[in-house]
């Protein structure tokens, strides 16, 4: 039977195509090992070919002129499934050249994605061959693409960006999230796929039986048994369809609203939010922040929206990932007038995502977005003007001067932006778009956003405009700390350049959760498992943290120093030095700890990092205080013990500003804002300008959170006296404007 099935020239040609496809995939990063991407590519290509071959086999074997179908089904299964050994064996052999981090996990995905896709496609072809009898391949071609089009339909017309599909299995959406944990839901969905596949086969058999009503036409169970099987299969399909929201196989807008629970409405927005998390003043401020940015963006982009924008706020990345996908990526769907944001990212992401929706007014028709991702994301960053707490032009100059910039012209092609590392791409595109807007005006840029025609609109080709922009950036000058910061932020590979990216991301996520649960021994085992696959920044940081929390300080020092000694990756491990400094501190090597922390501080990674490092330096410069607070930083793992230590010190030394500052931070972490304000107000002016800025900013933020807007303005005004970066002044001035907005607009939530 094998020889007969593969004796046709078209069948042999299909096997050759499958072989060539498999070999090509071994040369493409991310597709070159047994994982999701490889399985998805094989599923799409071979399911299409297997369907056409099934129709060909039906016609060439003269099956339409014979009564039975059992032999044909067996031969079809051989034709569709046996060739799958080709890609499976090739990708397994490729493991000798490309690391395969999880053979078992990859095999499970291959089984769940590829096999059901091929069986579904063959059943569809079988049904069409029996039912239509003419133009069968054309009908299959159209039907196959309609089924695949379901992915676009679901992700384009609904809130979710993921989709379960009979042919692809699972589509994760266009997102920067590397973690992919879908096997349990995919298994459930594939049960439905196989049930529907069997229903199509039985329907085809029934149609063929009607054509050949004679004895022995079909070897299937008796009528009552067949009806029972059909009923059972139909129940499976129906249950998965009607309960798909609850099972995590889909997520309708109504289901998302119901899950979140809360809804507020303003003149320009409908805001769905987690009612268990957002209440009172915080809810009112988030609602008004929408209107505050609406006014800003209306002026900046010269646009007024024609309908209300719907914002969905999620309690956590996990909730967002479960409901729409893209757990760690905030996103906008301009064509639906929707934003999807994790509540913890609202201050950092709301304005950026709103720009995408506003830009829909002058975007490409129907989909209402820019002509390419470089213009889409570049405009959003250009309007914000700040990225990584730096003015966007300064940061872009830093990227360019350190030769870390991606191909700038390529960023404005159809796919170039997605291929490049995300961090540098956003900065470079944002700076370039800001330059075009400032130099040539918003009106011309809005036309560019829709068309992508640089030469027509600016009278200059893109390469010439890029050279102009590079000359503009030439006026910035940087020190060694700036260069170290640039290498840390941007000397990173995209997902296509990483080994076993998804497997490692899943393991690192597990390690992060174990650390949060203070299960340090288990976290250490998990990080070692990740590091066995490949060295990554996250895993190295997590392992060092686990070693510190377990009191294994010497091991922590050796591990951190071994990674920092490698010049090729030392820049990426910059923040690992903080843990190295803490480990030195734990070993009473105060001088080494001071040196390490001071070295990181000169990079000024962010306001929060500057605050954390300045506090450490203040403490380490005072031996008595360093001994007293050492347990707080390196050995006390329980929050209650850490707080108790600080409270004892504050009672014993009520005039010690550092411990009062630390205790205030603990009060903030436990949402005891009034107590935190009392402590910070009682702290005398800090000698360090970084810490004094942090104190005043925190007082302003706390007063704002409590709805004390006039008082918040005072603190923010005072903090302007201590800024040491241009971006800090811009951020504080934005807070001042929002306080003024809240004072005049009030806290009205419909």
Language model region names:
Residues 30-39, 86-110, 141-192:
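Membrane-interfacial interhelical loops
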Residues 35-82, 89:
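Helix-loop-helix units of permease transmembrane domains in multi-pass membrane transporters
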Residues 235-259:
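Hydrophobic alpha-helical transmembrane segments in integral membrane proteins
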Residues 36-42, 254-372, 383-391, 398-408, ...:
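Juxtacatalytic substrate-recognition/specificity segment
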Residues 1-58:
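Hydrophobic alpha-helical transmembrane segments
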Residues 34, 75-135:
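Secretory targeting signals
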Residues 150-194, 211, 224, 231-244, ...:
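Beta/coil-rich, acidic/histidine-enriched accessory regions frequently appended to metallopeptidases
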Residues 193-230:
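Cytosolic-side transmembrane helix boundary signature
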């Amino acid at each position: 039977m094998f020889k007969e099935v593969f004796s046709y020239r078209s069948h042999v040609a299909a096997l050759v195509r499958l072989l060539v496809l498999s070999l090509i995939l071994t040369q493409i990063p991310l597709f070159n090992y047994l994982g999701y991407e490889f399985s998805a590519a094989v599923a799409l290509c071979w399911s299409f070919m297997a369907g056409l071959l099934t129709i060909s086999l039906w016609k060439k074997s003269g099956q339409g002129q014979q009564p039975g179908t059992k032999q044909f089904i067996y031969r079809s299964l051989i034709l569709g499934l046996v060739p799958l050994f080709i890609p499976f064996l090739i990708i397994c052999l490729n493991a000798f050249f490309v690391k395969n981090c999880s053979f078992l996990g990859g095999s499970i995905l291959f089984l769940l994605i590829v096999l059901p896709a091929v069986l579904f496609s063959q059943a569809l072809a079988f049904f069409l061959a029996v039912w239509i009898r003419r133009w069968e391949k054309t009908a299959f071609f159209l039907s196959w693409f309609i089924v695949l089009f379901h992915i676009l339909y679901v992700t384009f017309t609904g809130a979710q960006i993921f989709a379960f599909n009979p042919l692809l299995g699972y589509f994760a959406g266009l997102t920067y999230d590397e973690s992919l944990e879908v096997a349990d839901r995919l298994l459930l969905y594939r049960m439905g796929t196989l049930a529907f596949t069997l229903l199509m086969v039985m329907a085809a058999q029934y149609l063929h039986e009607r054509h050949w009503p004679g004895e022995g036409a079909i070897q299937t169970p008796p009528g009552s048994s067949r009806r029972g099987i059909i009923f059972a299969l139909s129940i499976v399909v129906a249950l998965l369809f009607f309960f798909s929201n609850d099972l995590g196989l889909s997520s309708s807008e109504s289901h998302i609203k119901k899950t979140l629970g809360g809804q507020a409405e303003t003149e320009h927005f409908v805001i769905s939010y987690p009612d268990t998390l957002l209440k009172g003043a915080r809810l009112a401020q988030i609602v008004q922040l929408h209107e505050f940015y609406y006014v800003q963006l209306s002026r900046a982009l010269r646009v007024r929206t024609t309908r209300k924008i719907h914002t969905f706020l999620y309690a956590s990345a996990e909730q967002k990932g479960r409901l729409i996908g893209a757990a760690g990526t905030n996103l906008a769907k301009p064509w639906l007038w929707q934003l999807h944001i994790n509540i913890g990212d609202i201050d950092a992401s709301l304005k950026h995502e709103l720009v995408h929706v506003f830009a829909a007014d002058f975007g490409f028709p129907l989909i209402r977005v820019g002509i390419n991702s470089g213009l889409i994301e570049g405009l959003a960053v250009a309007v914000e003007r700040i990225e990584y707490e730096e003015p966007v032009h300064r940061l872009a100059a830093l990227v360019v001067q350190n030769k870390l910039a991606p191909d700038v012209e390529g960023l404005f092609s159809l796919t170039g932006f997605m291929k490049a590392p995300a961090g540098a791409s956003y900065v470079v595109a944002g700076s370039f778009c800001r330059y075009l807007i400032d130099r040539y005006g918003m009106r011309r840029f809005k036309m560019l956003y829709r068309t992508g025609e640089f030469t027509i609109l600016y009278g200059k080709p893109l390469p010439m405009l890029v050279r102009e922009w590079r000359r503009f950036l030439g006026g910035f000058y940087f020190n060694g700390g700036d260069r170290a910061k640039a290498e840390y932020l941007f000397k990173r590979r995209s997902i296509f350049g990483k080994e076993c990216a998804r497997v490692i991301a899943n393991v690192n996520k597990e390690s992060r959760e174990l650390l949060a649960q203070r299960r340090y021994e288990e976290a250490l085992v998990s990080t070692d498992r990740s590091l066995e696959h490949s060295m990554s920044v996250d895993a190295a940081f997590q392992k060092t943290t686990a070693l510190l929390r377990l009191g294994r300080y010497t091991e922590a020092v050796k591990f951190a120093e071994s990674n920092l000694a490698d010049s090729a990756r030392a820049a990426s491990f910059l923040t690992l030095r903080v843990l190295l400094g803490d480990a030195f501190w734990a070993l009473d090597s105060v001088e080494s700890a001071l040196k390490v922390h001071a070295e990181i501080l000169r990079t000024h990674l962010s306001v929060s990092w500057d605050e954390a490092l300045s506090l450490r330096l203040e403490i380490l410069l005072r031996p008595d205080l360093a001994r007293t607070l050492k347990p707080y930083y390196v050995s006390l793992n329980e929050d209650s013990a850490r707080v108790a230590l600080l409270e004892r010190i504050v009672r014993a030394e009520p005039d010690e500003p550092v411990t009062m500052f630390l205790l205030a931070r603990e009060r903030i972490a436990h949402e005891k804002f009034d107590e935190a304000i009392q402590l910070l107000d009682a702290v005398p002016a800090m000698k360090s300008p970084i810490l004094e800025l942090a104190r005043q900013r925190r007082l302003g933020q706390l007063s704002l959170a409590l709805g004390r807007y006039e008082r918040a303005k005072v603190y923010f005004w005072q903090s302007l006296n201590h800024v040491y970066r241009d971006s800090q002044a811009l951020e504080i001035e934005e807070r001042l404007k929002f306080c003024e907005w809240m004072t005049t607009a009030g806290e009205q939530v419909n």
